[in-house]
Amino acid sequence: MCKVKLGEVAIEHKETCKGNKDGYPIVGLEHLVPEEVTLTAWDEGSDNTFTKMFRKGNVLFGRRRAYLKKAAVAPFDGICSGDITVIEAIPDRILPELLPFIIQNDELFDFAVGKSAGSLSPRVKWEHLKNYEFELPDMGKQRELAELLWAMDATKKSYQKLIAATDELVKSQFIGPLAHKDFSGHTAPMRRCA
């Protein structure tokens, strides 16, 4: 393990869409879910003012109001808000599959909040974010960590789907049968609680 700065293993991806935006998914801050490492929402269409490009595998970091902990890996190429910093792994220094988990962690967000400027809508710049220091293992261990973390993320998502399905089942079993009943004229006495 060695201590590295984020800017030694990743760069800010700076690419601008100068032509037609048709066909590119659009990502705004509202699409980044706090504390989620994967991007699951975006808009389609070209009716926006965004011009910042990102590529599949880049990490999209919500630089405005960093305390909201918004950062996710892009599953496709697209265009994003100027309030998103696009971070690209340097593959011979850090495994690109591990970078999203390095970014999406409390210590990095605490660092980002401490380096943010502005009172109403504080923003952190890449120039400050790139100085975040962390321990980084060798490539073999990075691969092991990435596999484990992605497996944990998949398990978490499966669990969330199970909870949602269970919630729907409970609603259908208890609320559904009562939805078509006529309760007019049937009242229960009310008591005042002190």
Model-derived features: positions:
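Non-catalytic DNA-recognition/assembly elements of restriction-modification systems
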Residues: 1-17, 131-147, 154-194
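Sequence-specific dsDNA recognition surfaces
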Residues: 4-17, 22-56, 190-194
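Residue-level recognition of specific faces of alpha-helices
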Residues: 70, 123, 128, 148-151, ...
